[in-house]
């Protein structure tokens, strides 16, 4: 079986965006979401740490591209993600995203 990157992104991007929307809505903290996914689902890292690793600018760019192609709200980048990118909080590469990095 061959895995195409677009298929992987079709699953991963909504997962990341859902976690970002939860933080933006005040439903849970970034720490709580990531802890729940690591402890409760045995993921190696939570969705927000993963977004920080990928780069919030990259995550936003992929989401925008997928949204423009499909017009599905599932892929619409959350306002919090766009605010962080605009503020230069791009994740690990800038030392700050959803978590601080030293």
What does each of the following model-derived ranges do?
Residues 1-7, 13-102:
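NAD(P)-dependent Rossmann-like dehydrogenase/reductase catalytic/cofactor-binding core
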């Amino acid at each position: 079986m061959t895995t195409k990157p677009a298929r992987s992104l079709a699953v991963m991007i909504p997962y990341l965006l859902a976690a970002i929307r939860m933080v933006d809505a005040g439903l849970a903290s970034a720490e709580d979401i990531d802890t729940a996914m690591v402890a409760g689902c045995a993921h190696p890292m939570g969705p927000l740490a993963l977004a920080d690793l990928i780069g919030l600018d990259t995550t936003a760019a992929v989401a925008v591209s997928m949204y423009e192609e499909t017009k599905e709200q599932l892929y619409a980048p959350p306002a919090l993600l766009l605010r962080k990118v605009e503020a230069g909080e791009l994740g690990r590469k800038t030392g700050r995203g959803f978590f601080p990095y030293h």
